[in-house]
């Protein structure tokens, strides 16, 4: 196994150790966003580096997000797309100009986000989804996406 693949697998293993609101043994108020707010602050507020199209609803969000992303890309904008869940590869969740984020970029960004998240003790709860969202926002900022 090559070193980049090993690092990728190590990052995936660490990500899986972060709990989810749904499976946590401790009840939490999921409306409180202190954990993700602190993490984004410590990352330099990557969510402020690009314009966001937020898609909500029951069905068709992934397809709608992909279509909007492609249309913006055709117009010459650097576009990112963050969707959930993934089917096979976690990198399906984060696309840059219509392509899955590379393992190298994913590992670099995830390593930084996880390092900061690990440094918190006795602070608000962070979930698997919070961590992945922060990774996506950081990737989009680092890769100079204009629309996400």
Q: Model regions: which residues?
A:
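A conserved segment at the C-terminal end of the G1
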Residues: 51-55, 63-83
């Amino acid at each position: 196994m090559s070193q980049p693949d090993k690092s990728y697998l190590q990052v995936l293993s660490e990500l899986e150790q972060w709990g989810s609101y749904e499976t946590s043994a401790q009840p939490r108020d999921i409306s409180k966003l202190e954990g993700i707010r602190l993490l984004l602050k410590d990352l330099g507020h990557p969510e402020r580096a690009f314009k966001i199209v937020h898609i909500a609803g029951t069905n068709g969000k992934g397809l709608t997000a992909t279509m909007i992303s492609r249309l913006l890309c055709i117009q010459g904008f650097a576009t990112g797309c963050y969707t959930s869940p993934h089917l096979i590869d976690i990198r399906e969740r984060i696309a840059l100009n219509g392509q899955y984020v590379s393992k190298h970029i994913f590992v670099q960004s995830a390593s930084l986000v996880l390092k900061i998240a690990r440094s918190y003790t006795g602070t608000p709860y962070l979930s698997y989804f919070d961590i992945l969202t922060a990774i996506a926002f950081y990737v989009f900022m680092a890769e100079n996406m204009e629309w996400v």
